[in-house]
């Protein structure tokens, strides 16, 4: 660094926050630039967009009925009917055909709620 830039740097270190903000405004006006949009901002925004897409891919979950103990079949059948809206025969076929997906493409909250209900009824459930 040259002596001149060292001297400017030392002067800047002594400025208060209010004085520094005023200096920024004066520099923006004098040189016709803006301190609000840094050059790397575009790269950061693009990276944030890619990260958001990765998160979006994980917003849909499948609730899979893995196993139903014989003594819990009726309780699980009632819960499956409530969750899916299926008729008695369709729900019975689904429960007896485990492992089978109960709900597909649902939100994480819905998937966790369904899993909790099914587990309370005695079923073994996974969320994928």
UniProtKB/Swiss-Prot annotation:
Database matches in InterPro entries: Ribosomal_bL12, Ribosomal_bL12_C, Ribosomal_bL12_C/ClpS-like, Ribosomal_bL12_oligo, Ribosomal_bL12_oligo_N_sf
Keyword Glycosyltransferase applies: no
GO molecular function, one term: structural constituent of ribosome
This protein's record includes keyword Ribonucleoprotein: yes
BP-aspect Gene Ontology terms: translation
GO CC terms of this entry: cytosolic large ribosomal subunit
Keywords of the record: Ribonucleoprotein, Ribosomal protein
Stated role: Forms part of the ribosomal stalk which helps the ribosome interact with GTP-bound translation factors. Is thus essential for accurate translation.
UniProt subunit comment: Homodimer. Part of the ribosomal stalk of the 50S ribosomal subunit. Forms a multimeric L10(L12)X complex, where L10 forms an elongated spine to which 2 to 4 L12 dimers bind in a sequential fashion. Binds GTP-bound translation factors.
Family according to the record: Belongs to the bacterial ribosomal protein bL12 family.
Protein name as annotated: Large ribosomal subunit protein bL12
Source organism: Synechococcus elongatus (strain ATCC 33912 / PCC 7942 / FACHB-805)
